Amino acid sequence: MELATMKTLVMLVLGMHYWCASGFPVYDYDPSSLQEALSASVAKVNSQSLSPYLFRATRSSLKRVNVLDEDTLVMNLEFTVQETTCLRESGDPSTCAFQRGYSVPTAACRSTVQMSKGQVKDVWAHCRWASTSESNSSEEMIFGDMARSHRRRNDYLLGFLYDEPKGEQFYDRSIEITRRGHPPAHRRFLNLQRRARVNSGFE
């Protein structure tokens, strides 16, 4: 068992040496860059939020890194934010306590952060409510500007994709067509009653 483990480790080391020697782009970025990207993403969310309170990240994960050159890269992150007790004027939400309660606003967010030499150059972010029970109208109230700005920059987001539910529009149209083609049951019932009265009057 130990011999097999040693062979696996040796093969792994040799493989990494091969990729580095063959000119494969290996970017050893500082872990602090990830924290900078997350902080910039949360700041972007708070700048576009219409809530009177600041949001703070609860969980985060790095989904993809696109290396543009030796100094510039683009990070794609996914994270969740929750409303804190600090007002917008507080500035930094990192030390703010989370609000308590059943209906505290929590959102799932995606961001694309462009960094150069360890410094944040540009940030794009988009959020949706983590709870499916929230309505689209309430989402627009707090994150109204973010959805519009995201759609405008869709073609520029190097590897950042947002999966919109394509079936919603078709579903709404089908309901509308059904409503136009078939009047409600009580109206059909009234029409039948009217015809019955007219026919009985001529008899």
Swiss-Prot record:
Alphabetized Gene3D superfamilies for the sequence: 3.10.450.10
A single GO BP: protein-containing complex assembly
Phosphoserine: residues bearing it: 90, 137-138, 174
Keywords: Disulfide bond, Phosphoprotein, Secreted, Signal
Posttranslational mods: Multiply phosphorylated at serine residues. Phosphorylation sites are present in the extracellular medium.
Coiled-coil residues: none
Main location: secreted
GO cellular component, one term: extracellular region
Signal sequence extent: 1-23
Subcellular location: Secreted
Domain of life per record: Eukaryota
Disulfide topology: 86-96, 109-127
PANTHER family: SECRETED PHOSPHOPROTEIN 24
Recorded family membership: Belongs to the SPP2 family.
Job of this protein: Could coordinate an aspect of bone turnover.
Protein name according to UniProt: Secreted phosphoprotein 24
Organism of this sequence: Rattus norvegicus
Gene (name only): Spp2
